[in-house]
Amino acid sequence: MVIKIHDLRPAPGSKRDKIRVGRGEGSKGKTAGRGTKGTKARKNVSPRFEGGQMPIHMRLPKLRGFKNRFRTEFHGVNVGKLAAAFPQGGTVGIDELISAGLANKGELVKILGDGDLEGVKLEVTAHAFTGSAQEKITAAGGSVTKLDR
């Protein structure tokens, strides 16, 4: 025998009829099983209501300060990483940093002073430099050139 989709029926007793409440004066009529009056008899309780406990939105601190929409964000590259990526020395610009994987295209690059140059002479061109990075590059015999933002 082939079973067809229109022959399928749920097992007897597995489905119950939906109870329609609040229709007429029967057992589920009028107050619809909710008792009389009070908050629980009304439509619903606000989802943020925590039963009289101080709610989470009042327990948490307020947001302070503001976010500057006009801030300039730099991608930092440390001097130690420059020495590792360019051990032979030479000219290091934004394009060289991108090809070495130290910066992404379109980012403003700032050279930071963490690490050692270990005598590597670099001519570095970037958008910004920290004081310590500038000192380390010039002390190793290199030069620093700032780009316009």
Swiss-Prot record:
- Point to the regions of Basic and acidic residues compositional bias: 1-28
User: What is an example of a Pfam family matching this protein?
Assistant: Ribosomal_L27A
UniProt keyword annotations, A-Z: Ribonucleoprotein, Ribosomal protein, RNA-binding, rRNA-binding
Recorded hits in InterPro entries, A to Z, give: Ribosomal_uL15 (IPR030878), Ribosomal_uL15/eL18 (IPR021131), Ribosomal_uL15/eL18_sf (IPR036227), Ribosomal_uL15_bac-type (IPR005749), Ribosomal_uL15_CS (IPR001196)
Can you cite a GO biological process for this protein? translation
Q: What does this protein do?
A: Binds to the 23S rRNA.
On subunit structure and binding partners, the annotation says: Part of the 50S ribosomal subunit.
**Name assigned to this protein:** Large ribosomal subunit protein uL15
* Organism of derivation: Saccharopolyspora erythraea (strain ATCC 11635 / DSM 40517 / JCM 4748 / NBRC 13426 / NCIMB 8594 / NRRL 2338)
